[in-house]
Amino acid sequence: MHFYLQNIKINTLKFFIFVLFFSSCKKEEAAKIELFNNPVLSLDKPSNFPEFDSYNLRTNAPTLVGVEIGKKLFFDKQLSRDNTISCNSCHISSYAYGDHNSQAIGIQARVGLRNTPPIQNMIFLNTYMWDGAVIDLKDQPIIPIITHEEMDSSISEVLRKIQKEDTYIKLFKRAYPDGEITSKRILECLAQFMFTLISANSKYDKIMRNEDVSFSAEEQKGYLIFQQKCAFCHKEPLFTDQSFRNIGFPKNPNKIEEKGVARVSGEKADLYKFRVPTLRNIEVTAPYGDHGQFTSLEEVLSYLDQGVENDTNLDPYLKEKGNRIPLSKEEKKYVISFLKTLTDYTFIKNNELKIIKT
């Protein structure tokens, strides 16, 4: 009898230990679930747009917390060596994430080589930068971070700063199972935020989607002229064909550094070729050209009308047209009226920085 009771006590004790252990495990598991809660975001593709770039989505799908980390990093001056500028210093939302300087201005008022390109619809593109130096968006932030004329820092220095900040520590614990802050993840999160910067709500877009909006007579004339004389390079709906062309714009005085795509490829055939920029939100992204050669759209169109600089590798389309795109005074006015329909006021006014609670 005594042996039987002793067995019951032992078994009961084992049962309670098991219950406590199981309960503890469940609590730990629940805590982990609460800590790591980072669903993949479903980006809405505008109906009049092409498919997203599959490589970017496959290798770095945007997540709820990843995007928030990227947004915080984008506005964080710690990415620069002396903590004085952030990505947002040059990429300002009200200018379609560009700025109004001819060339980018970095720390200590250093002047960069090129005009700041706007950040919009990056998820639809397959290469980045004026010269196509980057094919994976998560590698793009490395260039401004390490460039002497821009942030003049290093990835390791940025990592050191970010790893010390309590808000980032909490956010990374929510974003990744192990909570580790790494340089790779910093770059991935920046790219995820940039993926969400989709501009597709201009007057033009609403017309293309049959949303009970129509062009004015002047805008309609401009659209027809645009289709005849501009759409060869600035293809709808992104208003770029993502090609690189030498269109005979005035050259950057810094001829030692500036070679266009040839700076990357080393090929003479690529001299002074640059990415065909998107014309979306063009109304708010002056000045124009690879180093801000033109202060207004009128200047750009007048230059194309008068005749561009001749080069051995000038784009064949321009050569066929006698090195110019002829436009009358009225045509220029109509084209500019149309280009203003590409302004997405919802996009350029969306400048709030809201970080999720940690």
PLM features per residue range, with description:
Residues 25-358:
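Periplasmic c-type cytochrome electron-transfer domains
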